[in-house]
């Protein structure tokens, strides 16, 4: 459905901000898709993060939902909940599902802001 060249372009960061005027946090995007964003170093609600592998791309939704693809593992994951959480980005519950998927695939750590194998 989607060629390798297009997947490669979808995986590359096309834009990063120190402050996104809509989300009010630092963000990273690739052709309209969100990339891994590590804002754990910020305090309070500004610490909203979405920790994926470097090649992964997708988007979070209000209340904690997420959908993404990870070309290097041939994995895709979608999560919606029956009760919205607080905030605009991925919440702890959603991130824990992402973390479990990467750990099951043998990835070791997301300490550097992206899942690393």
What label would you give each PLM region?
Residues 1-117:
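Catalytic loop of the DD-peptidase/beta-lactamase superfamily, centered on the K-T-G motif
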């Amino acid at each position: 459905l989607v060629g390798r060249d297009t997947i490669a372009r979808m995986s590359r960061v096309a834009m990063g901000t120190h402050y996104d005027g809509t989300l009010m946090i630092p963000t990273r995007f690739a052709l309209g898709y969100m990339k891994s964003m590590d804002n754990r170093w910020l305090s309070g609600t500004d610490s909203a993060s979405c920790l994926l592998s470097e090649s992964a791309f997708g988007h979070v939704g209000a209340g904690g939902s997420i959908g993404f693809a990870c070309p290097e593992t041939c994995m895709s994951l979608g999560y919606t909940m029956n009760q919205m959480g607080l905030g605009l980005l991925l919440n702890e519950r959603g991130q824990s599902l992402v973390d479990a998927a990467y750990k099951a695939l043998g990835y070791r750590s997301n300490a550097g802001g992206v899942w690393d194998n």
